[in-house]
Regions:
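Phosphate-end processing signature that detects enzymes handling 5′-triphosphorylated RNA
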Residues: 2-292
């Protein structure tokens, strides 16, 4: 084979950048609420604070992040084909809130819930919405590995790729419109004194149906509170083709999931997983189907 033929047969190497996210869900119980949602903690922002997760005094340090109001409009085909393929497509609007705008109360069942004291984003603000998609690499609905796509073109390309060009972004329909009030804490130091291997965030979400809030009513009755611990990493390769990058991405996602699992097991009293945590989309689908 000629030298030119060898060059033509060689795989094309390039700089490839992608995002990897792994997450594990938990039920925010009374211990979580007492440590993270007390009046004193609610006033702390951009200040490191050490938490002790268990009786052996295993500790980690967090910094509370600004609260957010998030509107997610999810899209799929009429037969939910994208969901079946492990792809979730949405338009997301994020509004960063001023210090301590969210107040929490505790219900009789000891679940922490956010008081609904914030307005829904207006139609004028929807121009700031961004297209986003999450493709599941592995795991299940409680413990999941994702790769993310940001921007309309990347999302559109992924929809075409995963459906083998059978479905365009314009062919999708709205399947849910949800409003999330979010509190989050960035983990800066683990029990061994080291920093997490990637950006680690503890998240508490209260989710409602956006349309019901927009109508000024509570007619939907849908409300769901769920916690997550997430690891997010930007992955860059310089010496791999697309196939090699994809394989490396899956390896990294698996390692990060193992790290997340260990962190939550060490602090099992804070991040309870019994009964099995239910994600917001699963909870919404169950609620919606019960009303059909």
């Amino acid at each position: 084979m000629s030298q030119m033929g060898l060059k033509a047969a060689a795989p094309r190497l390039q700089r490839i950048v992608s995002n990897v996210e792994v997450e594990r869900k938990f039920n925010p119980g009374p211990k979580f609420a007492s440590l993270f949602l007390s009046d004193g903690q609610a006033k702390l922002q951009a200040q490191p604070h050490e938490f002790y997760g268990n009786k052996d005094s295993s500790s980690f340090t967090v910094i509370r992040q600004p609260g957010k109001l998030i509107r997610d409009t999810y899209y799929d085909t009429h037969d939910s084909n994208l969901c079946k393929l492990g792809l979730w497509v949405r338009q997301r609007y994020v509004h960063v809130l001023p210090s301590n705008p969210l107040r929490f109360e505790r219900r009789q069942d000891d679940k922490a819930v956010v008081e609904r004291v914030l307005p829904l984003p207006t139609d004028e603000s929807r121009a700031n919405e961004q297209w986003n998609a999450k493709l599941r690499l592995g795991g299940n609905f409680s413990n999941t590995q994702f790769v993310e796509f940001d921007g309309k073109k990347k999302v559109s390309d992924e929809v075409l790729r995963i459906t083998k060009t059978k479905t365009r972004l314009e062919d999708l329909r709205v399947v849910s419109d949800l409003l999330t009030r979010r509190l989050s804490w960035k983990v800066t130091r683990l029990a061994n004194g080291s920093a997490p291997s990637a950006k680690m965030t503890i998240v508490l979400d209260e989710v409602t149906e956006a349309e019901a809030i927009n109508d000024g009513s509570d007619k939907s009755g849908f409300i769901h509170t769920i916690g997550e611990v997430e690891l997010f990493e930007e992955l860059v390769t310089e010496d791999k083709d697309n196939e090699g990058h994809e394989a490396h991405r899956k390896e990294v996602a698996t390692r990060r999931m193992d790290e997340l699992k260990e962190f939550m097991l060490v602090n099992a009293g804070l991040f309870t997983t019994t009964p099995k945590p239910i994600g917001k989309l699963s909870a919404y689908d169950t609620w919606s189907n019960s009303r059909s």
